[in-house]
């Protein structure tokens, strides 16, 4: 992999990008309402360039997700989908679905516990993005707010900023150069590393998104509750995980095979 250098990018603010933002939901009603209120309140000129897709990963919430999305459907460009089978952790399958349904070249894939400001959206829509690049983002750690924020990445709490492992500003050709997220990991919290490794590094390079270098743009992880968010997820310690990892790596090393893998293993419907 090429070494990432951040100081040699000439950021151009002369282009306006249409961007689709996709989030997966699994019963986090408060966070869903937060995002709906946030996107409802952004300036109209920005709304014209932003589409938001919520994908309900079969959360058993008695229709609350659908009701909320329908209540907000006229306040911003909103599309919502519901997966019909609860197969456990399926964030990556939902992302495959979102990318298949997206109508824009540029897409921001985030988790529903990611909070951000309008300034960040303005920067993404007003910056000339390079088609041979995809972008990662700083994560703000607020240990007073939530001492358990991503403890596995910073057990000694030495870091102030790291790149989030699952937040991408990425164009469609770059995303599909991976063949999509690997559905072999459905039900397990695994697959971020394999997705990153499957990106065609001969064509695409990753950069930290930082138009002003010293700007305060960041994303904040709000109360992730990672261990209890799915009712029936399989843990990463199941015996066959390593077999899945080995199989996926071998397949993704084959450019032909990785583009023939299944993208969705569930029924779904569009709500809004």
Spans of features found by a protein language model:
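The conserved acidic donor/metal-binding loop of glycosyltransferases
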Residues: 111-115
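C-terminal catalytic/acceptor-binding lobe
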Residues: 186-272
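Cell-envelope/extracellular polymer assembly enzymes that use nucleotide-activated donors
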Residues: 17-22, 51, 194
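Conserved catalytic core of nucleotide-sugar-dependent glycosyltransferases
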Residues: 99, 117-184
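Glycine-rich, basic loop-to-helix element that forms the pyrophosphate-binding segment
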Residues: 85-101
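Short aromatic/hydrophobic "clamp" motif used to bind/position activated sugar donors
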Residues: 107
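Short, well-formed alpha-helical segments that are part of the catalytic scaffolds
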Residues: 28-43
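Acidic donor-binding segment of Leloir-type glycosyltransferases
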Residues: 39-85
């Amino acid at each position: 992999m090429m070494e990432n250098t951040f100081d040699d990018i000439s950021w151009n603010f002369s282009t306006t990008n249409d961007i689709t933002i996709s989030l997966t939901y699994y019963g986090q009603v408060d966070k869903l309402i937060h995002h709906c209120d946030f996107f409802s309140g952004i300036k109209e000129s920005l709304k014209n360039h932003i589409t938001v897709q919520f994908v309900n990963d079969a959360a058993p919430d008695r229709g609350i997700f659908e009701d909320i999305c329908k209540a907000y459907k006229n306040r911003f460009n909103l599309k919502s989908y519901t997966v019909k089978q609860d197969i456990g952790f399926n964030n990556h399958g939902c992302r495959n679905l979102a990318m298949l349904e997206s109508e824009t070249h540029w897409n921001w894939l985030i988790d529903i516990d990611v909070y951000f400001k309008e300034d960040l959206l303005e920067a993404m829509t007003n910056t000339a993005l390079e088609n041979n690049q995809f972008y990662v983002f700083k994560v703000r750690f607020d240990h007073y707010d939530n001492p358990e924020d991503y403890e596995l990445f910073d057990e000694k709490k030495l870091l102030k900023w790291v790149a989030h492992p699952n937040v991408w500003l990425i164009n469609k050709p770059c995303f599909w150069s991976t063949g999509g997220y690997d559905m072999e990991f459905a039900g397990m919290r695994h697959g971020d590393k394999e997705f990153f490794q499957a990106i065609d590094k001969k064509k695409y390079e990753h950069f930290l998104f930082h138009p002003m270098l010293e700007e305060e743009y960041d994303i904040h992880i709000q109360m992730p509750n990672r261990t209890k968010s799915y009712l029936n997820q399989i843990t990463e310690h199941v015996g066959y995980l390593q077999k899945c990892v080995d199989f996926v790596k071998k397949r993704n090393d084959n450019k032909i095979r990785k583009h023939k893998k299944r993208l969705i293993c569930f029924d779904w419907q569009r709500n809004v």
